[in-house]
Design a protein with these regions (language model features):
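Peripheral, non-transmembrane regulatory/ligand-interaction domains of membrane transport proteins
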Residues: 1-103, 107-110, 114-121
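Hydrophobic alpha-helical transmembrane segments and their immediately adjacent juxtamembrane loops
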Residues: 113-182
Length: 182
């Protein structure tokens, strides 16, 4: 979506503090809008993780690793995209930049906290994905074990029968029971 649309409207209509404050406040508002967009994206992935978890427990014999891998790849991409923002905000706060007022550094500190929250949530989601991989593998192993039980049962029945057929199906004349009358 257009995350800067609200900011453009405020600038055009002279609403809010944006027109009254300096350019450093505009930087804060723009960065804050970027960070807020990550919350929407993380909400989407939280729903996706919940759906994957439900599917893992409903469809126990299906392999969900491709979906998990896809979400993990997206979360890695998200983390890599927000990491530079952390450094930019930190430099804006710490370095002596004349255009950044001390009051705006307080706002930037707030945005930096939000960036750290987003990074932490991404890390939590990736750990959750690891748990989902383990759960998926446990379900697949359980399904495989049940198949092996059935195959073991079948082989237990047919191995003795195969042995008897093999012994009595041999073509030789000196077998003790071949010439008996019973």
């Amino acid at each position: 979506g257009d995350y800067f649309g609200i900011i453009r409207d405020r600038l055009r209509n002279a609403k809010g503090k944006i027109r009254k404050k300096c350019a450093d406040y505009l930087i804060y508002v723009l960065i804050d809008a970027i960070v807020d967009s990550y919350y929407d994206i993380l909400d989407h992935y939280a729903n996706e993780l919940e759906a994957i978890e439900n599917d893992i427990f409903i469809q126990k014999n299906k392999n969900h690793l491709s979906r998990i891998h896809h979400v993990n790849k997206d979360l890695i991409y998200l983390r890599r995209s927000i990491a530079p923002l952390n450094e930019v905000i930190f430099r804006l706060m710490k370095e002596e930049i004349v255009l950044i007022q001390p009051e705006s550094k307080i706002f930037l500190r707030d945005v930096l906290d939000h960036v750290n929250q987003v990074v932490n949530q991404i890390d939590v989601d990736r750990e959750y994905l690891s748990d989902l991989v383990q759960t998926n593998m446990a379900n697949m192993n359980s399904h495989l074990n049940s198949i092996i039980k059935v195959l073991t049962l079948i082989s237990t029945i047919f191995i003795p029968l195969t042995f008897i057929v093999g012994v009595y199906g041999m073509n030789f004349d000196n077998f003790p029971e071949i010439h008996s009358q019973n």
